[in-house]
Structures are given as structure tokens and as C-alpha cells.
């Protein structure tokens, strides 16, 4: 017998869950990837993609076809799917979808601010923004000279407003301060999203909390790695770490003191989930830390579909689709640049 919560889930969200599971079934198979890596030109790639769920998404693109055009059209297709889910959702799933868009909004804001710093035209930078993170006030981002101005002039009416409470500063937004702002926003965002999922309870919490814990720890590890050799102090580094992961609190304290990659690896070795990831870095495959993180993320998101009656399938599908898109872009770049030796270095999903 289904529990009451599960019965209610099906009444409110069962249609969309069935739909997203159907979408997941249309992800590229291993045989599709075998066919893609054999393509000689981007036009060949386009023809093969037409035989998959991507269909004729490039039909209106005139020659010459570029990797950038393929990437843009794939993003638009994903955005159309996401908008359909979101527009047909009821609360609290609607709020869950809003949380999902916040990470893209943060990336878009940072992209626009860096563009303004480099005196690029707003139109040029907007074209590079992710469609899932678009909002009406975006074009005004370039008028802000400090985090406080950015909040008051642009973000106060957006879903990002609550995450700005720890980021208020009158400091001029130079390149370093913009990067610090990105990490502080992500920290607040992940902690809030984690709390939302945990408070929701049921299977959504059981599936989403481990996924967000991993994302929080991944950010802490990548921030640490990227801070080596920079002017970022150890104290400032620690303030950027999300506190909703498995590394909190002791692991984060040790990471803040790390001097190099080996020191960082020793911290990770204390955690059963992260030791094998660090052990897999390098080796014969030449994998980077980012590669092994992506592989682990794919595994977790595939497993999310083994459970029913939860919101995690929507998050997992978007993440798996994004990895698929990265794979296609990687293969397309190798074909375009005639650099086929690493064409198989994509991350399989199914």
C-alpha cells in the first residue's frame, strides 16, 4: 500500500514525474556515443543527432555549423523542457524549481559583472548567459559598482535576494571581489536549498540531501585547489566553504589550512566517499579532480531515478542532460579541431 504522502505526491506531481522519467529514457545511449565519435564533420554530427531525441533542433541553423551554435541550441532545448515542468508544477515543487534556477542566475550575474569590468557590450555578454538563469533585471547589472549597489538596484526583487545578506559590501567590484561574491552567493544558496530539501522530508530529503552535500564539498575542495598561489588568505578561504556537506565541520577546518594538493588529498583520505575520488586523479587516464567529480555526480543522479515520489528526479535529469551536453560539445570540439586522440574522453551516463 502507498503511504498517504505518496498518494498526495501522485495527485499533485505524478504527471510531471512520469514525464521527466520519459525524458531521462531518451538520453543518449553508449551506442549513440560510439556513432558520434565516428563522425568526420559537424554536419555528420548534426545528422546523427537528428536520429535521437534531439531531432531537428539544428534544422534552422545555416552553414557553417559551429560548436557554439550546437551548444546554444542544446541549452535552448533543455530550457524549453524545464519551463514546461515549471509552468505545470504546484507548490512546493514550484519553489524547488526556483531553487534549481538560482545557480544559473548566480553564474549569469557574475558573467555580466566580469563583462562590464572588461568593457564588453551587454548584448555580447547576454548572448553567453544561460537561459535557465535569465531574469528581467539582468541588463542593469553593469551599473552596479559594489555588492550593496547590485542588491539595491538589481537583485532585491529576485530569488537571489535572501542569499545576499552575507555578501553586502561597499568594496569596488574588481575581478577578485567578483569571484569572492560568486562563492559567497553559492555558499548561501546551497545551504538554503539543502535546508529546503531537509525540511521537506520524505524521499525528496533522502535523495537530494546527499546530492547537495556532495555539491557543497566539491565546491569547498575546488575553492581550496584554486586558492593555492593566490592572495586569498586561509581565513577568507574558510568563509567561502558551504557548511552543509560531509566535510563540515572538521574537514573544512583542515581544508582551510591546506598548503597544496597533497595536503588537500590527506584531508580527503579521512572520508570514505572522497578517498577513492582523489585516488583516481591522474593515473593512466590522466583524469583531473574535476573529471572524477563529474563522474561521481553522474552516478548519484542516475541513482536518484531508482526511487519514486520525490523531486530529486527533476534535479537529476537536468544535471544528467547538462553532462550529456558537455559530452556532445567535447566530441564536437575534437571533430572541429581535428584533435581526435582525446575524442573518447567524455563521461558516459547510461
Curated annotation (Swiss-Prot):
Gene3D superfamilies: ATP synthase (C/AC39) subunit, domain 3 (1.10.132.50), V-type ATP synthase subunit C domain (1.20.1690.10). GO terms for cellular component: apical plasma membrane; early endosome; endosome; membrane; plasma membrane proton-transporting V-type ATPase complex; proton-transporting V-type ATPase, V0 domain; vacuolar proton-transporting V-type ATPase complex. GO terms for molecular function: proton-transporting ATPase activity, rotational mechanism. Epididymis and vas deferens. One of its GO terms (biological process) is vacuolar transport. Keywords: Hydrogen ion transport, Ion transport, Transport. Pfam families: vATP-synt_AC39. InterPro entries: ATPase_csu/dsu_sf (IPR036079), ATPase_V0-cplx_csu/dsu (IPR002843), ATPase_V0-cplx_dsu (IPR016727), V-type_ATPase_csu/dsu (IPR035067), V-type_ATPase_csu/dsu_dom_3 (IPR044911). Subunit of the V0 complex of vacuolar(H+)-ATPase (V-ATPase), a multisubunit enzyme composed of a peripheral complex (V1) that hydrolyzes ATP and a membrane integral complex (V0) that translocates protons. V-ATPase is responsible for acidifying and maintaining the pH of intracellular compartments and in some cell types, is targeted to the plasma membrane, where it is responsible for acidifying the extracellular environment. May play a role in coupling of proton transport and ATP hydrolysis. Regulator of osteoclast fusion and bone formation. Belongs to the V-ATPase V0D/AC39 subunit family. V-ATPase is a heteromultimeric enzyme made up of two complexes: the ATP-hydrolytic V1 complex and the proton translocation V0 complex. The V1 complex consists of three catalytic AB heterodimers that form a heterohexamer, three peripheral stalks each consisting of EG heterodimers, one central rotor including subunits D and F, and the regulatory subunits C and H. The proton translocation complex V0 consists of the proton transport subunit a, a ring of proteolipid subunits c9c'', rotary subunit d, subunits e and f, and the accessory subunits ATP6AP1/Ac45 and ATP6AP2/PRR. This is V-type proton ATPase subunit d 2. The gene is Atp6v0d2.
Amino acid at each position: 500500500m502507498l503511504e498517504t504522502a505518496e498518494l498526495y505526491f501522485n495527485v499533485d506531481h505524478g504527471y510531471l514525474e512520469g514525464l521527466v522519467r520519459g525524458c531521462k529514457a531518451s538520453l543518449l545511449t553508449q551506442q549513440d556515443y560510439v556513432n558520434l565519435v565516428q563522425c568526420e564533420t559537424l554536419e555528420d554530427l548534426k545528422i546523427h543527432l537528428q536520429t535521437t531525441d534531439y531531432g531537428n533542433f539544428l534544422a534552422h541553423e545555416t552553414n557553417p555549423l559551429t560548436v557554439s551554435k550546437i551548444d546554444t541550441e542544446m541549452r535552448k532545448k533543455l530550457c524549453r523542457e524545464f519551463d514546461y515542468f515549471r509552468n505545470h508544477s504546484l507548490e512546493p515543487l514550484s519553489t524547488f524549481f526556483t531553487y534549481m534556477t538560482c545557480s544559473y542566475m548566480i553564474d549569469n550575474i557574475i558573467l555580466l559583472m566580469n563583462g562590464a569590468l572588461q568593457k564588453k557590450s551587454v548584448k555580447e555578454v547576454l548572448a553567453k548567459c544561460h537561459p535557465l538563469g535569465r531574469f528581467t533585471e539582468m541588463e542593469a547589472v553593469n551599473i552596479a559598482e559594489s555588492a550593496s549597489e547590485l542588491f539595491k538596484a538589481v537583485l532585491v526583487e529576485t530569488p537571489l535576494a535572501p542569499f545576499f545578506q552575507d555578501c553586502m559590501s561597499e568594496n569596488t567590484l574588481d575581478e577578485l571581489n567578483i569571484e569572492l561574491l560568486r562563492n559567497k552567493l553559492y555558499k548561501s544558496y546551497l545551504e538554503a536549498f539543502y535546508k529546503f530539501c531537509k525540511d521537506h522530508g520524505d524521499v525528496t530529503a533522502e535523495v537530494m540531501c546527499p546530492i547537495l552535500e556532495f555539491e557543497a564539498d566539491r565546491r569547498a575542495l575546488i575553492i581550496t585547489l584554486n586558492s593555492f598561489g593566490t592572495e586569498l588568505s586561509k581565513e577568507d578561504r574558510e568563509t567561502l566553504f558551504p557548511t552543509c556537506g560531509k566535510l563540515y565541520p572538521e574537514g573544512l577546518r583542515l581544508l582551510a589550512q591546506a598548503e597544496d594538493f597533497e595536503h588537500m588529498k590527506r584531508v580527503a583520505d579521512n572520508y570514505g566517499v572522497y578517498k577513492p575520488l582523489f585516488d583516481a586523479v591522474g593515473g593512466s587516464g590522466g583524469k583531473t579532480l574535476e573529471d572524477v567529480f563529474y563522474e561521481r555526480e553522474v552516478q548519484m543522479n542516475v541513482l536518484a531515478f531508482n526511487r519514486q515520489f520525490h523531486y530529486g528526479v527533476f534535479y537529476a535529469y537536468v544535471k544528467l542532460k547538462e553532462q550529456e551536453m558537455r559530452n556532445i560539445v567535447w566530441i564536437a570540439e575534437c571533430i572541429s579541431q581535428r584533435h581526435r586522440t582525446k575524442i573518447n574522453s567524455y563521461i558516459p551516463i547510461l
